[in-house]
Amino acid sequence: MPTVGIKKVILDKHFKRVYSEKEFDELCFEYGLELDEITSEKAAVEKEQGTRAASDLNDQEVYKIDIPANRYDLLSVEGLARAIRIFKQEIPSPAYKYADVPKTGLQKIIVKKETAQVRPFVVGAVLRDISFDADSYASFIDLQDKLHQNICRKRTLVAIGTHDLDTIQGPFEYRAEAPKDIKFKPLNQTKEYTAEELMTLYSTDSHLKAYLPIIQNHPVYPVIYDKNGVVCSMPPIINGEHSKITLNTKNVFIEATATDKQKAFVVLDTIVTLFSQYCAKPFTIEQVEVVYEETGVKELYPLLSYREMTVTTPEINTKIGINLKDEEMATLLNKMSLKAEVAAKETLKIVVPPTRHDILHACDIAEDVGVAFGYNNLITKLPESNTVAVAFPINKLCDNLRIEIAAAGWTEALNFALCSRDDISSKLRQPDALSHAVHIGNPKTLEFQVARTSLLPGLLKTLSSNRDMPLPLKLFELQDVIVKDSNTDVGARNERRLAAVYYNRAAGFEIIQGFLDRIMRMLNVNPARDGTGYYIEADENSTYFPGRCAKIIGPKGVVLGHIGALHPEVITSFGLTLPCGAVEINVEPFL
């Protein structure tokens, strides 16, 4: 969930009144938002970078507001204040419209076929006669950053470029060229660089280096030229210095290149609808014509589509648990920046503006009705039918086991279900384990790459983090592991396991075996080799020390797991220095 930080004085300016902290907190709650924190620029920088870095900043209050991830129209103070003022019925919903076609015609972007290799789509728009001040200019830049981090998925799906139209001339060309053939002066630089040189230059830039891999391995890079061959931008990396916008910019040319065309529509609509309020003719946007040279297809942007939806009031009432009349529900929806009217008895026709791309289904309409009605006004009542909850047998069994194990002097550990690839393979001396593991498609950290196939890595990490505690350390965990299974509909299944480790100056095999005996006694399983009880049998497992490992065989000859002294390489790979005994069994056969 993105967080927007806005100075209180700017909020007051846009709301045209002063809210107290309590009033604004309640107002946010009414609209389905949350005032996360009240801080200041100085306090925020002091917290992250220290007192010296914050010495030149001011102490003006900054309200940090949590915004739903799909409400891109609330990512700037312009959209937030407008939406809440409409909600408070202080202003009507604006009507977004296209500007008249200039005498010189619409601006054009001609798309060359080579762009299909790297970023095939582009959209554009023009904001004419716009007036920026310091606050609105900063908000304009900040909105682009917020969009890049959210819907644009860090510029992989969409990259936004904004330019001073008075410094460049159309028609524009969107090309894809070899890096050595692209040369221009990038934003905030004093000399020209080739695209190859820029990749080296920005490889150490804390902000831009994250975007380099998006195009770095492509044979061609995307680039936008104006009529005179001036480079406007090299998306998704950097804009050109020549066309950068300033406080004095009067006409803004907006382009957005994309790998996802739908996301580009949404991004462009969001920017122009929020900032067209600063144009001489508010909420008026000039279109840009995009021409695909290879196919001859011509498209006009932005779309500014007003979509129509039809819902029935009984359906919405049932979802929320209220009983509103048609007219009452229409009034509530109008407060949420929608245009609703009664089309027929128990039927509403709703017009969704281009700011509300989050409205996709009748459920979204129901959510807006709930917000406008007020969640605090919903009456809680008991359902007409009773359903009595019953614990799953496996959970009931595990809860009983936990109580008994803790009573025996063992401490329970709770570890993450995800771990690194090394944790379940090389560190456990199990090179084949990765073929049985469920892998995360796009892991954010090295610690969360696969779903665990064993409980031992988590317990050994816990030991490593607590090795300064008094010995012995006796830990257990009773949780799920995830293993591949082609017989299930998703190709994997959960398996409930119990694992324990004993860490001391001696491996304490007798301690860990005593733990196993106690567990079996609690499960009413006696030592026996006739298929009715359990027994251990010497076995080889590379995780354990040779000659000090056994497999545990349960009723009906089912192999439950292994017990033994861990191999020294396993112990040292987790940062431990003393011997360690371990046991891990599957508890599901005991159901």
Curated annotation (Swiss-Prot):
| Keyword Ion transport recorded | no
Q: Which cofactor does it need?
A: Mg(2+)
Protein name (Swiss-Prot/TrEMBL): Phenylalanine--tRNA ligase beta subunit
Residues annotated as binding Mg(2+): D358, D364, E367, D368
Query: Keywords, A to Z?
Result: Aminoacyl-tRNA synthetase, ATP-binding, Cytoplasm, Ligase, Magnesium, Metal-binding, Nucleotide-binding, Protein biosynthesis
Keyword Acetylation appears in the UniProt entry: no
**Coiled coil: which residue ranges?**
none
User: CDD domains attached here?
Assistant: PheRS_beta_core (cd00769)
Which catalysed reactions does the entry list for this protein?
A: tRNA(Phe) + L-phenylalanine + ATP = L-phenylalanyl-tRNA(Phe) + AMP + diphosphate + H(+)
Enzyme Commission no: 6.1.1.20
The gene name reads fars-3
The cellular component terms of Gene Ontology attached to this UniProt record, alphabetical and capped at eight, are: phenylalanine-tRNA ligase complex
Per the record, a Pfam family?
Answer: tRNA_synthFbeta
Q: What class of enzyme is it?
A: ligase
**Family label:** Belongs to the phenylalanyl-tRNA synthetase beta subunit family. Type 2 subfamily.
Molecular function terms in GO for this entry? Answer: ATP binding; magnesium ion binding; phenylalanine-tRNA ligase activity; RNA binding
Q: Can you state the subunit structure given in the record? A: Tetramer of two alpha and two beta subunits.
GO biological-process terms attached to the record: phenylalanyl-tRNA aminoacylation
Please state where this protein is localized: Cytoplasm
Recorded hits in InterPro entries, A to Z, give: aa-tRNA-synth_II/BPL/LPL, B3/B4_tRNA-bd, DNA-bd_dom_put_sf, Phe-tRNA-ligase_IIc_bsu, Phe-tRNA-synth_IIc_bsu_arc_euk, Phe-tRNA_synthase-like_B3/B4, PheRS_beta_core, PhetRS_B1
Q: Where is the B5 domain?
A: 304-380
